Structure formats: structure tokens, C-alpha cells
Amino acid sequence: MIIESRIEKGNPVVGMETTVFVHGLPRKEAIELFRRAKEISREKGFQLVVIGILKGKIIVGMSEEELETMMREGADKIGTREIPIAVAKGKNAATTVSATIFLSRRIGIEVVVTGGTGGVHPGRVDVSQDLTEMASSRTILVSSGIKSILDVEATFEMLETLEIPLVGFKTDEFPLFFSRKSGRRVPRVESVEEVLKIYETMREIGFEKTLMVLNPVPEEYEVPHDEIERLLEKIELEAEGKEVTPFLLKKLAEMTNGRTLKANLALLEENVKLAGEIAMKLKR
């Protein structure tokens, strides 16, 4: 079998990408996050499955040991487009949001969690597959908005053009990963029940898009977006393609003395909690 699913029958399930662990965080923090996310899922009563490709096999529910193998041996960062190539060639591959949504939907997972989604990069034609996958797959994605390193205006416009619905969870503003505010308004929801009512409406009318549930970084960990923008102006880009985002995130962590790293870990933990709550109430 190409796909090895370790989903336990009857449990509410949340899917999670592998790129955040393999390419988005230092190894020590990545393993700590994996353990903490698993701990949260056990405490709350849902199953968190980390999805990746190991030696050509798609694994839904990777173990800590398998994740460490990917980190040690290396793994390509892949979107939906690259899945069949990675499998056919027997590669290790870390899934991005797009690949995670695609694979989740194929096995019946309706709730996916991440830190920040991809979008439109500034200054060049570089548009993430995350956007096109969200435009064609009905699921619920919990995130803290788009990554702060992107062209915010262009990405926000692209979300509208692609008809991707988004709601702010207890916020009126579109969050920007490390930052709580962007100056762009979004419809606000106050509860998981409101989220599920919107999602059920999508299902009833055949609206095959991803519902983005935007959960801002905790206030005490926020790094204001104007500070992020000033720092980005100072960075000389030494990467291209899929390596741009990991490169910039690493540079920002260095330049902020780890503040962006702490923000990343904090928002991911909160997003896992919210995604689990949504999955549990969806299951009922």
C-alpha cells in the first residue's frame, strides 16, 4: 500500500504537516513541539496525525522516531504537485499545507492544523500551492494567517479571487503569523459552534473550498508586523524556490534573539488545541 494510515477508528482526527518540523524549526524545538502536540491531543481526547512520506510511503500518523529519521536523512519539502514523484522515487518528503490538505481529504480527515500558510512572495512570480489546494478542497484549516514574510496585499487579494472563505476566531483582523494585526478585516466568530455552522453550510451547498479559521498568536508572544518588515528589508536573500521560507524564518529568529521562534511555538500549540476542539465537535 502506498498509504499507511494509523488512524484509530472512532476518534476525532486532526491532520498536521511535516514541513513545520523538518524545515520550519530547529531540531530540538521540533521534537519538543511534536511531543507537546501529542500530549495535548491525548489530554483533550482527539488524535493528531502528522503526515509525511518516508522512503516513498505516505504515512498518516508518523512516530517521533520516523520524524527524527526524516530530519537526520533529509527530506524534500513538497506541495501537492510533488506527491506522486516523491512516492514513485522512494523519497523522504515533508508535506506543506497543500500536500497535507490533499492527503487528509483522501482519507477522510476534515480538520488540518498549521502555523501559517503560504501565499504570494514579494517581488517575483512565486505563488504557493497552499492557495490553489485550499481553493479546491473542502476542509477546515486552523492557522495564524499567512506567514509574515509574504506579500500581504497580494496574498489577501488572491484569497478573495480564489473564493477561499476565512473567519477570525475571536478577532476582527487577519493575523500575520507572528503578528496579531494586519489592518485587514475578516468576519469574526466567537465559538467553535459558529465555525461548524459555516462549514456545514459549505457542505450543504457543495462549496468545495477550505475554510480558514484564523487564530492569532498569543498576545504575549506577538512580534509586531512593522518590526518584521524592517528586519526583512535588511536580509539579503540567499535561497530560492521552496527554500526561501525556511531561510527567512531562520534569519528572523536570529535577528530577534529567538522571539519569532517562541512566537511560532506558542501559536502552533494554541492552533493544535483549537483544531482538536473543532474536530471533536465535528465528530459529534
Curated annotation (Swiss-Prot):
User: Carries keyword Cell wall biogenesis/degradation?
Assistant: no
Amino acids binding substrate? 77, 97, 128-130
Could you tell me the superkingdom of the organism this chain comes from?
Bacteria
Q: Which Gene Ontology terms of cellular component type are present?
A: cytoplasm
**Reaction it catalyzes:** D-ribose 5-phosphate + uracil = psi-UMP + H2O
EC identifiers of the protein = 4.2.1.70
Pfam families from the UniProt entry:
Indigoidine_A
Q: Which UniProt keywords apply?
A: Glycosidase, Hydrolase, Lyase, Manganese, Metal-binding
Q: Does the keyword Protein biosynthesis apply?
A: no
GO biological process per UniProt: nucleobase catabolic process
Q: Where does Mn(2+) bind?
A: 126
Which cofactors does the annotated protein need, by name? Mn(2+)
Q: Which residues form a coiled coil?
A: none
Which top-level enzyme class is recorded in the Swiss-Prot or TrEMBL entry?
lyase
Q: Which SUPFAM superfamilies match?
A: Indigoidine synthase A-like
Q: Which residues form the active site?
A: 17 (proton donor), 147 (nucleophile)
Q: Which family does it belong to?
A: Belongs to the pseudouridine-5'-phosphate glycosidase family.
Q: What does this protein do?
A: Catalyzes the reversible cleavage of pseudouridine 5'-phosphate (PsiMP) to ribose 5-phosphate and uracil. Functions biologically in the cleavage direction, as part of a pseudouridine degradation pathway.
Listed under subunit, the entry gives:
Homotrimer.
User: What name does UniProt use for this protein?
Assistant: Pseudouridine-5'-phosphate glycosidase
